[in-house]
Amino acid sequence: MKKRTNTSKKPEADSPRARRSKEERMRFLRQNTWLVLLAVLILVAVILFICVLAGGSPQPSQTDKNEAGKTERYVAGYICADTASVAYYDAQLNEVGTVARGTQITYCTDEVLDKGGVRYYLTYFDSLRYGYLASDAITTDASKVVGETTVYVRTPQNLRIRADGPALGKLVEQGTELPVVGYDYLEDGVVHLYEVRYGGQTGYISGQYTASTLEAATEVYDRFGVYSVHAGRGDPYGGGDAGSLDYYPREKANFEDNVMPVNCYSLYLTCDPEVIGNVEKYIEYAKSTKINAFVVNIMDGTSVGYPSKAYLEYSPTAYEYANNTLEEYQAAIRKIKDAGFYCIGRLTTFNDSFFVSDHPEYAISDASGDPLYIANSYWPSAFCRYVWEYKVELAKEAVETMGFDEIQFDYVRFPDGTYQYESSGNINYHNEYDETKAQAIQRFLMYATDELHDEGVYVGADVFGETCGTYVTSYGQYWPAISNVVDVISGMPYPDHFTQNGSYRPWEHPYDTILDWATSAAKRQSETPSPAVARTWIQAYDAIRYPYNTYGAEEVGAEIQALIDGGLTGGFMTWNAACNLNKLESFRSAFDALE
């Protein structure tokens, strides 16, 4: 048998050069062992870091399983609840904050804590916030974010007939149970409008006026004694009981693309053609001072700025008597805004002879049904919701067509001087829901504010100077209740409107008169949990009472300083119905002294 031949070669002997190189490497390793170990550790750390980056980033998914049936580590979802926000916790399950329902989240399926049979997932709310969230507050179905099936009315409201329209339905009282059919959208976890069922019909109500339980809906809000202050004031003049009004805190509007000046220094302009047609002169004057805003009439009783489409539907007579064309008025407002001024549209609310001529059925009337002519005007009743719809539609159309930054409601009250009619029973307010005057005024302003906030503008209300007192006025204005609702409240404490006391004439002492008034108004501001900005009308005309004092820079400057010293720092508006440029020029030094 033939032997197998071994064809493998023996290893060749190392050359002297190779041996020296090998010895040097071994010597280096022996002398630098710690460096070698450090390099290995760094390499391992780098490899692990790369692995984390490659395999540990969130991979949002609508299911907990991937296509292979394996559980995903990171899952996208939403916060769900039957309240506007839910609590989240740290690793020891201590509550550390709240987050709004509807928030898009990513939760980690393998970072779970269990306590009392409840699972808590590590959840990322945004790039900076995270925490542990109970499993029942997490859903992957966007349609299940809102959990409530029933809500209870906290603040009486008229249901909206449609989510996208002004028409109002029935009034629902506090504590009313409303089955939820759906909703439109969320704002910071709060439902904007619930679709609810009531009286065999569906309607809409803002989530801010509801609660999830009957107990919460009927609880009296008295934090810091807010309610107690008003409950004891009663109803001395027939305008309503202060305790029956709403003082629940409201979040004031703050629009990023419509910034209200911290201090509004405002000139007033009528909608007369000679003013609208010469608006450049007022702009030129304002730009040479520290004035930063204009108040312009949309309508002032029977003085109508332009032919709004809203008039065609609600008051054709107003449309017919418009002072300017739509294009003329629009051009004037555009010039004001293009010049950089904050622009406020003023409209009178519940004194409107044109509307009454078109709709006498909604007028305050005598017992026989004839509209009453009170204080030089006919008055639509503030109890009538159709009137509310009209004024709010007019305001919204003005915002959309003209671009106003703010809408100011003047004459947002019942007429004063009605005692003789009320005492004799010869007056009909068409009070369908048996409300007080103050309730009707506050509820109108809630409705108007909600509607106009949806348009991205602020809402103001003018009130008589008398409202700085501690009572509900006979015409339904009560400062704390109004201030709690609107964005801006504007008193009208014209010194020549104050009562003379013996030989003391308040209009001869503008600083003292306004300081005393502002101090009282500031106290009313402190009596509401979410007060409005107080921007006050000042007298910018010569006194209409003996000795007919001339009001110039000294007097106007005194009024402005008194407001500040009294604690009302939201600015002012000059009331000069003539819009006299020479008169405005006389105030220049007072305006130059503004901060």
Where are the regions a protein language model picked out?
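Substrate-binding cleft of secreted/luminal carbohydrate-active enzymes
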Residues: 486-500, 510-515, 520, 524-595
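SH3/SH3-like (including bacterial SH3b) beta-barrel domains
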Residues: 89-101, 163-174
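Aromatic-lined carbohydrate-binding/catalytic grooves of carbohydrate-active enzymes
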Residues: 289-324, 416-423, 584, 591
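Boundary regions of SH3-family modules and the immediately adjacent low-complexity/disordered segments
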Residues: 63-71, 124-151, 197-250
